[in-house]
């Protein structure tokens, strides 16, 4: 009868396991992907507004909704970000708006919110895109 406890206690198993661990750890450390913050270079300038009333409303704990879709049919994926709005007790000098960024195809995004007419200033937490009316164009639902 083979005992698993005696098999795992053998020195060659322990040594090979440790060596495998260190070799794999070294390989993954050398080839690890790195994330680089390119927000400023990309042209995306967004700051989420949660309403900040100080009353601890549930809305103040939620983040922004985001949708990636090709709004202008140029085969580059564009970005729409939903923003919050002022809650009772909070007044911003400039109302926060949702933003549509057009992908220029070179890693740079351009704010086309005003041109596209999608600068909603009401409180939002999500959005979805699909061809809702079956006309072949992507529709945006906020």
Locations of the language-model features?
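Bacterial N-terminal signal peptides
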Residues: 12-23
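N-terminal secretory signal peptides that target proteins for export/translocation
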Residues: 1-9
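Acidic, glycine/proline-rich Ca2+-coordinating loop motifs
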Residues: 1, 24-142
């Amino acid at each position: 009868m083979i005992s698993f406890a005696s098999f795992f206690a053998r020195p060659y198993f322990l040594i090979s396991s440790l060596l495998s661990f260190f070799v794999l750890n070294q390989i993954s450390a050398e080839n690890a992907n790195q994330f680089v913050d390119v927000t400023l270079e990309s042209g995306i300038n967004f700051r989420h507004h949660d309403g900040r009333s100080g009353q601890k409303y549930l809305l103040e704990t939620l983040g922004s909704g985001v949708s990636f879709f090709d709004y202008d049919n140029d085969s580059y994926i564009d970005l729409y970000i939903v923003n919050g709005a002022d809650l009772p007790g909070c007044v911003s000098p400039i109302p926060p708006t949702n933003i549509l960024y057009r992908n220029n195809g070179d890693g740079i995004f351009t704010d086309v919110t005003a041109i596209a007419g999608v600068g909603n200033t009401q409180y939002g937490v999500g959005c979805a895109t699909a061809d809702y009316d079956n006309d072949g164009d992507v529709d945006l639902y906020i």
